[in-house]
Amino acid sequence: GLHYQPSQIIVSCGGKHSCCNVILATCQEGDEVLIPAPYWLSYPEMVKLCGAVPVPVLPEDGSFYPRMQDITQNVTSYTKAIIINSPSNPTGAMYSEEFIAEIVAFCESKGIWLIMDDIYHRLIFDGRKPFSVYKFAKKSVEETRIIVVNAGSKQYAMTGFRIGWAVDNKKLIRIMANIQGHQTSGPSAITQHLAVGAINGIQSCVESLRQTLENNRKVMMQQLEAFNGVRAFKPDGTFYCFAD
């Protein structure tokens, strides 16, 4: 497995807080941040907080799976970061390892930050296996442009506890700590201990939740497909279902 130093990790008041701190630490007025669409409603608002510009990326083939061509044709000299949430809120689409490998190589070569929101990465279906974006990095955590965000909210059903974290190089983590220090100081010590218990505890609860969600997906798809004129995208993970 991967090993990180404490100085390469920041713990925040939820994954949302971590995402916001990452954007505030990396972007400034006039920068552009690419976000594959449809996307979680908070991403563009976080980008706007620092005066940067959210740039929706719409796959030309009409699917929920962007191709590298969709990404690269939206890149300009102002592009500072790309946000990837896989599997995705709100579609449940999980991007292929090949696509993630391509986007890692692209971001490393162009010096663009790749913000990976892994909040749903263990809640995936049909035999899919979670993987770390760092397996595709050619550089160390200290040198790469990858930032990984996660939380206890979804995988451990700890939404109300507000505990999340981000992994990146020491310099950026220090900047994020400075920002967070003037926002919330830090997350509750109690919830931090509870999160440690969840992470180090028996992980069968995550698999049980995953199986429940996969069964729920089956029921949801059956119900939606029974309606005339309704098309539903079969999600690869999460607890969302995007119907048309």
Predicted regions located by residue number:
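Phosphate-binding glycine-rich loop
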Residues: 1-32, 140
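PLP-dependent aminotransferase-like
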Residues: 7, 24-86, 97
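Helix C-cap/helix->beta junction micro-motif
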Residues: 50, 109-110, 227
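Active-site phosphate-binding strand-loop segment of PLP-dependent enzymes
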Residues: 61-129, 134
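Active-site PLP attachment segment
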Residues: 136-175, 187
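Structural signature of PLP-dependent enzymes
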Residues: 176-180, 198-222
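Conserved glycine-rich beta-strand-loop-beta hairpin in the small C-terminal domain of fold type I
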Residues: 196, 211-221, 231-244
